[in-house]
């Protein structure tokens, strides 16, 4: 019987249990009760399964929230699974750039830096850039903005992000009737001289997480929509709770954003 190895990855503080599902039966890891237990035991924000590639993609990505819900994209999860593919020795078929399929469609992933030190050292990380889906439509509502960057996000600008009660206010907005029936993730953003400082309440986790890749992407696009200045057009630096990330994009007509990229660190934390 093949023993499934569990890997814990962290993408800028967003932690995941990751499984190599290319060989053996991993169907048990899709069960809600199993996902809940693993995410609780390993203190992660989700579980991912890397699946086999085919003639079109190098691998597939399945993402599940700690409550077992799936069907959405996770940006930091996408960066971590690209690092995981590199760790496993998977070679991209297309010019050094990985192609992978997630629930929201096709993505690319590129390794910009590889670990150069031991686990826990300042250089033990990958720097990964992934291409997100094109985004069209930003809807002003409830004192903020709503959009979909692979999953649903509400973005609200605040004067001091450190003073926000993210769990209380985030929960109220997450379940607001305007977002019924499935709700939304909620991001609070402070525009600072060094970039956008972001805190996120994630549905499925039902609390604040240390980072959210699709949320950071949403915040950058909303910042552009709202006219927030940036040193480089179509590029924003964003501070999650533990790390800096960047979002680059090409704005177009009718609030359509293409060539949307999320870049940041990914680390292999432990193996079980």
Model regions: which residues?
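A glycine-rich beta-to-alpha transition motif near the start of alpha/beta enzyme domains, typified by
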Residues: 1-124, 155-272
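Active-site glycine-rich loop that binds ribose-phosphate moieties when present
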Residues: 130-143, 168-171
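Internal active-site segments that recognize and position negatively charged phosphoryl groups
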Residues: 138, 142-163
């Amino acid at each position: 019987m093949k023993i499934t190895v569990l890997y814990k990855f962290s993408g800028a503080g967003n932690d995941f249990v990751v499984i190599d599902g290319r060989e053996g039966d991993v169907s048990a890891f899709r069960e809600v009760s199993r996902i809940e237990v693993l995410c609780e035991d390993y203190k992660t924000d989700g579980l991912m399964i890397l699946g086999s590639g085919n003639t079109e993609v190098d691998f597939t990505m399945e993402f599940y929230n700690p409550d077992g819900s799936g069907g959405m994209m996770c940006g930091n999860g996408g960066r971590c699974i690209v690092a995981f593919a590199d760790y496993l020795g998977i070679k991209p078929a297309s010019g050094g750039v990985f192609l992978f399929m997630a629930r929201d469609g096709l993505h690319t992933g590129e390794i910009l830096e590889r670990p150069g030190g031991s686990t826990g050292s300042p250089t033990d990380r990958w720097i990964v850039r992934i291409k997100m889906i094109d985004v069209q439509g930003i809807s002003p509502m409830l004192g903020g903005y709503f959009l979909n960057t692979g999953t649903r996000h509400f973005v609200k600008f605040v004067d001091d992000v450190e003073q926000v009660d993210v769990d209380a206010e985030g929960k109220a907005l997450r379940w607001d009737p305007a977002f019924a029936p499935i709700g939304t993730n909620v991001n609070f953003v402070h525009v600072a001289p060094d970039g956008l400082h972001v805190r996120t309440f994630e549905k499925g986790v039902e609390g604040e997480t240390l980072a959210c890749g699709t949320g950071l992407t949403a915040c950058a696009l909303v910042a552009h929509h709202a006219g927030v200045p940036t040193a480089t057009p179509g590029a924003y630096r964003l501070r999650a709770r533990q790390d800096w990330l960047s979002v680059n994009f090409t704005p177009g007509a009718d609030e359509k954003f293409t060539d949307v990229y999320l870049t940041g660190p990914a680390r292999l934390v432990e193996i079980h």
